Every structure is written in C-alpha cells, then in structure tokens.
Amino acid sequence: MTPQPLEQGGAVASFIPTGQEMAQRQNLIPLGRLIDFIIQRTYHELTVLAELLPRKTDMERKIEIYNFSASTRQLFIRLLALVKWANSASKVDKSAKIMAFLDKQSLLFMDTADMLSRMARETLVNARLPNFHIPAAVEILTTGTYSRLPSIIRERIVPPDPITTLEKRQTLQRLNQVIQHRLVTGNLLPQLRKFKIENGRVTFKVDHEFEVSLTVMGDGPNIPWRLLDIDILVEDKETGDGKALVHTLQVNYIHQLIQGRIVDSPDALAEVYNCLHYFCQSLQLEVLYTQTLRLMRDRLDDHIHVDEYIPGTKLTVSYWRELTNKDPKSELGYRLMIQTDQSDTTKQLAILHLPSIGTKEVDIADRAVRSELLSMERLLVHTVYVRSLARLGDLKTELQLFLKDVDYSIQGTPAMLLVPVLNPCLRAEHIYITVDTHTGMLRCHVPKHLDCPIMPELQHALNNDRSKLQHLFSELRYWITQRRCEKTLQHLPATTQERLPLVFPADHPIEKIGPHRVYIQMCRHANVILIVELKEKESSPNEMTYTFYLVLVKPSSMEDSQSVTAGGTSQSSAPSAATTESDGMPKMYLKVLSLIEFDTFVATHGPGTYVDEQTVGSKRKLLTGEGPSAKQSKTIYPAYFIPELAHVVAMCDEKLPFVALAKDLTRRKIPHGGVQVEANATSLVLKLLTLPQPKPPVIPVSSSAAAAAAAQSGPDQKPPEPKVVSVPKIDKDVWNALLKRLLSVSVRAQINKSIQTRMWTVELVFYGTPLASAHHKEQGMRRAVYLTYDMLPVDSVDKFVDMILNDWSKIVYLYTLVHDFREQIKNDKYNLHNIVTIKSYSYTSLLLAYGPNKEVNVNIYWDTEAKEFKMVFTGGNNAINAHSMMRDQLQAHLNHNYDLAQIVYLLHETYQPLSSIAKLPIIPHLAILQSPKIPVLSFCIIPQSPTLLRISFQGVYCLEVRLRGSGLCSIRDGAYSRFDRSHVVEEFTPTQGLKGFLSKYVDETAVYRRRSQSEDDNPPSPITMEDPHGGPASVGSTFLSGGAMRGPQSPRDPGLRFAAPLTPPSGSNPHTPASPHPQGIGGSQSHPNFNMTSPPAPHMPHPSPSGGLMPSSPLNPQPSPMAAHSPGPTNLPYMSGHTDSPFSAHSPAASNWPGSPGMPRPSPRPGQSPDHKAQKRLLIISLKFTAPHHNTSRVLPARSWAGAIPTLLTHEALDTLCRATIHPQKEIPGPELSPLERFLGSVFMRRQLQRIIHQEDNLTAITSNEPGVVLFKADNLQYQVFLNPNHMQSLHMKVSQAPMAPTMDGKPPYQWPPEDLQILEQFFDQRVAAPPYRPAVVTSFTRMLNLPSQVMKDFIQIMRLDLIPELGQGNKWNVQFILRMPPSATPIVPVGTTTILSHRQKILFFIQITRVPYLPNMELKDSVTMLLPMVYDMTVNHTQLAERREQIIPQLTSAVSAHLRRFVECTVLQPGECSLFPAVRDLLMNLTLPNEQPPPGQMGNQIGTMGGMAPGGPGGPGPMGGQIAPSPVGGQVVSSPNPMMHSPMQMGGGGQQSNYGGMVGGGAQSGVPGGPGAGGPN
C-alpha cells in the first residue's frame, strides 16, 4: 500500500480515540443549517408578536417591538461576525489538523511502549518451544509423504465401496420373498386384500381412505414390521382448495403412533388398518360436515339443517323442511344420516334415509360417499332426485284417474313430469311439473305460455287441494286453445278479443253460445265479427271442437244500447277502441244485427279445399263399410295452427268484399251474376252483365254559394241547381257499337306480391278494335283491358264502384272520339292515314304518331278527375315534342270540339313551325335587369291558342306568331295592342326595325304560289264564307280558313277554316285605352281585379309552356320561373263565339301571368255542331288558303307601328330565323345564334345604349334623321351606332373627331389617330355589341368613353393587344380587356355588373392575362390565366393591383402585385405620359411566376427546377379559384350550337375566356380552332 502524506489525514485519523472523535463531531454544525435555524426562530418570534400585540396597550406594543428588534439585531450581528470569520477558517482548520496529528503521534508512542511492557512481563514468561516430531519429519523429507495418520480418519471421511447392482437386485428379491411368506402365513383382513409387493416393501391400498407401505428388516419370524410411508387418500375437491387435508406433522405423529403399536402387537397389520381406518372415517365425516356448513352459508340457507354431528361417528342432515312443515304425512321429516357401523368398525360409512327409499337407490347413494369426489351436495342432489321421482310417480297415478289415454313422461334432471293437455300438443305446450329441489314443493309451468294466469292456481292445487285439478286442466286447455287462435290469425287480417261490448236482446240466440268463446274482428270489415265456440270432445277431453258464428254488428251509442238492454242484454266489458262521434254521442257499443251459424263441415269442405281420400285395403271394406274410418290425406300443420279457423277466417275475408260489392251493385241497379267460383277453384269472380251509360258529372253547389243565393232570391225561390260539366255526347249508335264489342266484365281479387296488399282487378274483354294499331299486343280479336284498384274497407265499397264507373266513362268517352275518327281515317279523301299513324289503342288511351317521320307521339285519354280529355306529347330525336308548349290550348280545343280529325290536322300543320320556334333558347340569364341576381329567360314562349303564340325576348320585346295553313305563318310586334296599333302594351317595348328585319325573309313567290294552289284546289265554299266585318275565329280563323287582312283598327289574319260563331261581341278589352267595340253593349264591365299592366290575357291563368319544353338545349335545364315576366295569352269571356270580333279564340287553359286575376274560363270558339256528320265537318276543316285582301309590301311603312302589321313568312323562313347559325360576317367571332336572337339582342343593346346616353352627364345625345341610328358625343369624339343594313344582325359603331374649340390654356384639343378610332370601332363590334347581350358591357364601354383622353388612349392600346395578339410578339402574356364582372374575380364589385369604376381620381378596371405557350407540346389550355383587378391613380400616375387587406393574397397574385410595385419604383416615365399602358405592357413582357418552369434553353443553367404549372381549366389551381384558358392567338373562335355556352347562369370558378368578350364565362373555351365554343363573353 502506498504511504499517504500526513497532511491528508489518512493514517493519523484512524488513531483518534472513539470518544474524542464523537465529541469533535458533536461540536460541529453546518453554517447553512445555522442560518436556517436563525431565520426560523426570527419568523416564529415575529408570528407570535403579530398575534399578541393587538391585545396589548400602545406602550407595551412599543416595548415588545423594541425588544424583538434588539434581540434580532444582536443575533444577526453574531451571524455576520461568524460569516466573516468563516471566510478565513481555512487557516484555522490547517492549524487544527497539525495539532491533531501531533496528539495522535504521542498516543501512538505511548501505546507501543505499553504493549511491549505487557508482553515482557506476562506473555513471554510462560512461553515454551514444542518438541519436534522427528520420525514424521524424516519420513516427509525422505519419502515426500506421510503414512502414519490414524485409521479413524479414513473410516470417518472415506466412504466404503457401494454394493453392485446385482447384489442390490438379489437382496430386494429376497426381501420380497420374506414379506410374501409373512403375509401368507399371517392373518390378513379382507379390507387389506388389495396390496402390491415390490422393491422389498408391501403397499396396502384402501380405496378413498389411505395407502400404507411396510417392510421387514430381516427374515426372522419375530422381527417386527417397519412402517415406511403413509398416504391419506381422503380429499375435499369442493372446499379444500386443492390442499392436503392432513398436515405433514399429523402424518408423522400417526406414523410414530402406529410404529410404536405394531412393535409389540401380535396382529400388526390389523392394528395398522384399525388406526388408519378410524382416522379416515372421522376425516370423511368432518369433510361432509364442513361442506354442509358451507352449503348452508353460501346457497341453501335454511333449506337444509345439521340436526346432529358426532365427530368420527355420525352426521344427520335434514332437507325439504318447507314440505315437512306443510305435509301432514311427513311428521319425521326428510333426513339423511351418515354414520359408522358400531358393530363392525371395519366397515365403510353407512347412509340411512328417512323416510326409507328403495335398495337400489340406497346403493346409488352409498356410492356418492365412497366415490373419488366426496360431496355432500352430490349426495343431497341424488337423494332429492330419487325423492322427486317418487313424488312425480304418485302424482302421475292420481292424474291418470281423470286424464286417460294421455302419454305421460317423466324425464330430465331435475325430474319433470310432462302432461299434454291437448291433442295434438307441442312439447312447449305440455305442463311441466317438477319438484322444487330446495323446498320439495311441486312447481308447474307451460314453456310456451310463461304468463299463463291459470298456473298459480294450478300450482296451489297440486300442493294442497288436488280435487280441483280436473277443472283447472280444462280451463288451461281452453286458455291454450285461445292462444292458438291468436297464433293462427297473426298473419291473417283479423284480431282476436276475449270480450267485446255487444248489445243484443235477452232472447237472442247469441246467449246459447257457450262461455268459452273467441271473438274475431275482421280488420277489413268493421261490421262483421266471427265468434268461435270452443268445446271439449266427450270421448276425448284433450281434443277440441270448433263452432263458428258470423255476427253482423253496427256501432251503437249509450242511448241505443239502453233502448236495447231495456228488454235485453248488454255483454260489454270495456268500451271499444274504435269510437266514432255521431250526433255528439260516442258509439262505444256494437249492436248485434244478425247471427249466422256456420256448418263447420260445409265451411271447411267447400271450393278451394282438398277432397277427402279413402285409403281402402280391400274391395270388401269399400262395399260393406266395415273397419276403421278412412284417414284423410294428412296435411302437416304445426300443433298451434288451427286449419279450420284459418280457413273460415280467410274465406270470410275473401268473400265479404265480393258480397258487399254485389250488394252495392244491386243498389245501383247494375246487373251481375253474383259471387262465383272460377273453374279449377282458382279464385272468386263477380261477373257484371253490363255497365251503365256514363252520366254527365255534376259540380255540387258549395254551402256558402247556396246560402248567398238563398239570401238574394228570398225564401220562395228554389235553391240553385248544381252545374253540369260539359262532356262528349254519347250517340245511341256509338253506345250500341261499344256494347256489341264488350264481351264480359269480371271482377277478381288479387294480391300484390311486391307490397303484399290486396287489390281489385277488373277485366273488360272486347271484341276487336275500331282502330287497327301497329302495337304487337293489339293484333288479336280478343282485347282484354285490365283495371286495378286498391281494396278499400267494406264500408268504402261504393268508392270502388265509383272508380269502376269512372274508368268505364274513360273508355266510353274515348270511344266516342274513336268511333267518329274511324270513318274519317278510312276515307282517302281526307288523307288522314298519311298524316298520322295509330301506334296503340287500348280502349283507355289512344297513342298517335305524326310528324315527317312519325317520330313524335301524342297520347290522348280521358281524365276522370278533370272531366276532360288530356294530351301527352312525347318523342323527338334532339328535343322533346314541340307541341308540349301548346298542350293546354290543344286540350281545350279538343274538349270543345270533340273532333280528333281537327286535332290531327292541327298537329300536322303546326309541327314544323313549332319545331322551329322550339329551337329558340329558353335558358335563364343573369345581369339582364337592374338587379343582376334575378334570372331572366332569353326567350319565353307564351301560347295563346292552338295557332297563336307570343315570344318574349328577355322580358322586353314580344313577337306574336300566328300559324297558318299551306306552310305559312305571320309575325307581328306583340308590344302593340290589337285594337289600337298606336298604343303600346305596358309590359313590352316595341321592337324597332322589326318589319324591315322580317321583310328580308319574305318569299313572296312561295307565299303567292301557295295561296293560288290553295284556291285552285279548294275554291271558296258558301259554307266557309266569312262575315266581311268579322274577325278571326278561334282556330277557324287561322291557317285552315280563309280570312282577310284588315286595317290597323281590325287586324284580321287568315287561318284555319273552321266554323265561326254568329253572335255580336258583348264588351271590349280593358287593356287598351281605345277599343273598336262599344262600351255600353250589354252593360258589360271589366273585371275589378284585372291587371292593367299586362297585355290582353284570358281570365284564367294557365301554366307557361316552358315548364315542359326545353327543345333547344341539349342539356335540357329546368326553365326559370321568370317566364312569368312575359305576357300570357289574350282573351276575354266576350271574345268567344262572335264572327265580328277582332280577337282570335284562345285557349281556355290557365296562365302563369303575374297578377292575372282568376276569372271564369272562357269557352273556346265552337265549330260546327257535333251532331253534323263527319263528312260535312271535314269539308269545313279541309285545308284551304284564301288570298288576303291586301298585298304585303317589303317597303317599310312610314308609321311607327309598322311592326304591328303581320308579316307572312314560310315555314322555311321561320326555321331560318330560329335556327342557330354562324354570323353572316364571318370575321366577327361569336357563338352560333339564331338570326332572330342576334337581331333582338342588337336592338336590345341599342336601346340600352340610348338609356345610358340619357343617364350619363358627360354623354350628349345628338338628334339623328335616320331611323334606328344612335348619335352621341363624348369629349371631342362623335359616335354613331347603327344596325348592319344588310342583315340587321349586329350593331356597328363609327367614331369621328368632333370639331372642338381650343382648351382653356389655349392648347388645341387632342387629335385622335385614325388607327386608334378604328381599334375603338372594332372593339365595340366584337366585344361590346356581341352575344351574350348584357347592359353592363355597354355601361362599362360608355364609362370608358367618359375618361380623360390620356387614360382612354392607354385603354385603346390594351384593346389593340386584345384584338390583335400578334402585335405583342415578345410578350410572355396575352391580354384581354374585361367589361363585365365574372364570378371568378376578386369580390370587389357584384358579379355581372360593370367593371370600369371611376371615383376620387382613381379608376378601377379588369384585365385578363394568359401565359403564352413556351414549352414543347404546350397548349393554350395548359397555360396559366389570371384575372387582375387594376387601379390607376390619376393624382400620382401609378398603376397597381387592387387587393383586399383582410384576405390572404394568393401566391400568383402577390407576384403580380410585387411586379407592379417594382415597376412604379424603377420606371421613369416621360413628362405627361400615363403609366397605365406602360405598366400593363411591362407586366405582359416581364412577369415571371415563382413556380414557372424555365424554357428548355435555361434548364441547364438552373440548379433546381420548380414543379410544373398546374393545368388550367375548370377546377384547376389558379389565382381566382380556377385558371382560365384564353382564346387562340389571332384565331377564329368556332362557336358552339349549345345555347348554354353563353349563359351567365353557367359561370363559375375556372371558366374560360372567349376572344371576343374579355369576360370569364362558364362554358368551355375554345382552346384550339375547331374546339368547343366560347365561354361567357361580355
């Protein structure tokens, strides 16, 4: 060990005496702890002072405070001195260590001297050296070993050599022989006969008690047995928790005890057995006793009791203590005794039962004790099971006395007695009788009916008075049968009731019905109740017989029941759930009207049931009838199902509707054949011999109208009669012809499998058909018509009969049309077979195909609710049937004339013009009105009669189209009144230039040729001559009749040649201030609620035809409700039925006219009487065209109402007007529109321009002598706007420099270059006056014209780049000038409004820039497009991006904003130069987006490339929520025929831009020439 220096205190410290070291340690304290003590003492004293001072006087407080401060000051001064001293304590420590070292050295010297002195005086005095062992040393040194150790060491340490395996085997075998000899020669107990000798020992095993091993230590006869091992086999597997019952110490004690006894015992083996047997029996009794106590504590409580326990001798347990207390037969009770045999202690434990049980059962119980599982619970369970079998056996014997021929069975554990009460009986319907294992009482239940109310009483009888069992079993049998009835009827339309409030007289036969009955209420028949009487068979009580009674009832009130019960009986237990109020009294009772008893055999063996079949073994049995009765072929039913009841209920439910139907038919005097069963018993059928002729429907008079009429007429007058609805007249020959074709009428009932409901099916079989159709199912001579109806309750059977008669009227009225039409279509003179094809005639509807290729259909049928004929138009390849818009007018015409031939001619002649008109787009548009969010229909078609309709354009202009014969139609301006052409209807505005526009499409050659051909082929007939002073007749004055063109005060148009009425007019039109009719005729007045703001309209509003017609849009969008802004058809009640009325007869249908009052529907103008024969009527309606009384000139008249004069056009010209085509000037881009829409749109834009000129202060209107030309002046420019004189389909502008005086400062006015003025003109032509026509575009353009010349000059430069993109060859971006706010722009101004705003020397405008493709294979549709709101500040001459501060600026927009700010900071402009166009030009040339890919030449110079630009188009990422692709550079936009493409309703984020509007639309943009059409332009 390396020595340590003394300064470190290593060695010296160990020599400090223990007491001194501890003393030094006790005198030391850490400085930190001392400071803590001082602070705690000070805080304590301060706390005590604060608590005590308030109780002292002022002087005492001062004294205490001074004493505290003085003591505390002194204490902390000491602490301060101590701390200062501790700063130099290192020197003191070093001195102390030196002194301690010196003290330890002196002590060391002193101790050494004392120890040496003690050794010299005490230890070394008696010290001696030992004698050396010379021999051992010599031996070790010479030989290297030592052999003289004592032998005891070897004996104690070195073990002897073990014996070999052979010696061991021989020894054990010899020992086995010795043991075997001793056992043979000795006295061995019978209980020890089970032993095994091996390995020199004998092992005795007594089952379930012990196992012991013994051996002998020699072969002498007197050598005692040696006890080797004891194993106690008694176990407690229930309460022992798997532990041994005997402790090891106990086993060792028994081992020593037995070993001591067998040493001196003559019979050692008997002594071993006796000791161990007694111990094991005592242990078994103790285990059983312990288990019994635990059973009592845990589960069985007081149900068992330990009566006596003698350890090692006896255990007595009693059970069924409740039965012992109640049963007088068991005074001693039920006990179980387990005891040892006192006479022979070698025997096992014995079990005694009180009362005693059979020997076999006793042996089984004894095995429970001697088994491996020693269990008192098991012993009790077995004993209770044996006792239960005995009790149930006794009960079975008693039940057999009154329940004979019943199959009893005792089974299960615990034991159960199964007693069937019915035959057949489900196992779950047996009475399960068992013994309560705890109490010994009998328990019973029916598993299927656990809630049976009879069970408690039956259980009480089983345990007490068994004389009531027979009665209770009978009641249970009835109760279960009632439940079977409920189960049987759960899927049938019937409910069971135990009681019903029936009211009947005292002597009524219903009282004879037994007490056990079931009331069955039919769900579908409230007036019928089925009573089922239940009886037991006398020969076999377990079988039931059923008797059925049908009871007719009616609801009865309390007063009715009292009147009945005054002399009778009321069997009511509870009020019925179905209570009705009549005369203020609730009807809670059911009065019995009649009672019918069913013959059960007849009811269950009628039609639809199986025939009894006899299984006969021999012919002799068949002849003599001997032997048992033949068995019916067994149909397997569940035991709970009562087939007789189900059959009777189903039969009643099936036949009662037929009975009620037959009764109602008899009441209506409709002959029928009664209820019959069809062949093969398939179903019931009710055949009607004939059906009555339909009666005209009557409109009942309302109570209020009747009261008002009675008040006006007085008490003596008759009440008003109900009004009869007009229906077709049924001639006798038509009726007879229909009845001849009607072969049979059958009524059947069926089940609708899909919805599981019953329904009526009425089959009408006709012979052939009057009209041969092309339908493949209508070719045979047997024509069946099937009518289906939901089966209503029996009390509503009259409604069902009414429905049959209504559908019969449907067939009859349609047959009246078909019967007349049959003769007309066969006549080749009328050429109807070439006009129309009969696709189907099913007696209920008629389907006709017409049109050029017979591709459109009309379905005609009689509507039983509306009491009129209905027409449904279908078909068409590209659009729906164009006649859908005229459906109401055509229906009214058909319901007035009842002539199919006229309808066919109307459909044939009007199909082509209506198909052309249907091509006009009826899509709603936004931003037309002052409120940009209100949609307005582009075209709204308003039918007024079968041959007259109005077409409204954007709710401003109106055209009136009249369809004429011979391929002609007339068009006039519908804004003018029909009476006074100088008067304008307030709803519309006259269309300026309409006459000139229409005259460009007049084909005079075709018009006159068709007139001459019509006159040559069909000369005027005296029958069809018109009154020269009359007006056009409804349809008769349109294209099928010749009419004269009247003057302005009586516009008379030729039309269909139908019969005209011959009565004078009775009033005038309240719409117009001037009317050609006298006001006083008949004293007629206008309707008080008539809307004076609307044009002439019928007094019944009718739905707009646009509701079902969208022919021009492939997308077929739903029409807008703005169709109501357009006027409806015109007609008044006095217009109909007069030849001299200037009105055309219009449809009596309803109108959607806003504010139109509801007035009586006018009747259409009648034609010839329907009594006339078809030949005369067709002569009247044959196609003729009479030459007009004046010629239509193409020269525009000088009158302002020139458009009010009709212009005749051919159908081809009308189709040209309405068909969408490209612009006549191909250099003007735009979508495909119809010429009519272009003309009206141009007129509309011109009118908007005129309105804006009058509103704006800076625009000065100039009077023009040319009609249709708008002149105005702005700043120093003069503008002229006019329609194209060639085609009148586009607006054009001419700009010229106006002569201006010098300015205030003497400078000449700015002279505009001709190139700038030309750009301005081209921009107006292609971007402003272009579709879609929006007022906001004109407003933006005119506001731009008001701006200063230097600003407008820059705007013109932007327009130049917009119109001619090729000028910016080096630009990275193309630009478009936006004039209308798109929905994808920043929400600065409302969508659809103007985009140029000037306020406080700041100008807001919008441009759209599109990235020029710069990568290989990059197309315009993949380019980025941004819509930028720009702000030009005229005060500071800065151009910036308009941004909203609260919004998060997109990355692309922020890049543009940063670029513009950089331009403002770095660019130096010329004096007086506007920064607007330079900023835009710099943006187009130098803007680079942060995520833009570099061109291919710069890819190598870039360290990392950014991600590719996301594709534009709808939904793509972009600055405004979507990227907008521009139009191709310098390319011609190929427009789309889809009218949806230019609808602002389709505008959305990501819409694309056309190259003629600068505005983002919602349609697809033409990415390349030939692509889809433009989006939403200006």
Swiss-Prot record:
Gene name linked to the record: MED14
Annotated compartments: Nucleus
Domain of life where this protein originates: Eukaryota
Family stated for the protein in its record: Belongs to the Mediator complex subunit 14 family.
Segments of skewed composition (Polar residues): 1084-1093
Extent of motif LXXLL motif 2: 739-743
Biased composition (Gly residues): 1510-1521, 1547-1578
Origin organism lineage: Eukaryota, Metazoa, Ecdysozoa, Arthropoda, Hexapoda
Name recorded for this polypeptide: Mediator of RNA polymerase II transcription subunit 14
GO biological process, one term: regulation of transcription by RNA polymerase II
PANTHER family xrefs: MEDIATOR COMPLEX SUBUNIT, MEDIATOR OF RNA POLYMERASE II TRANSCRIPTION SUBUNIT 14
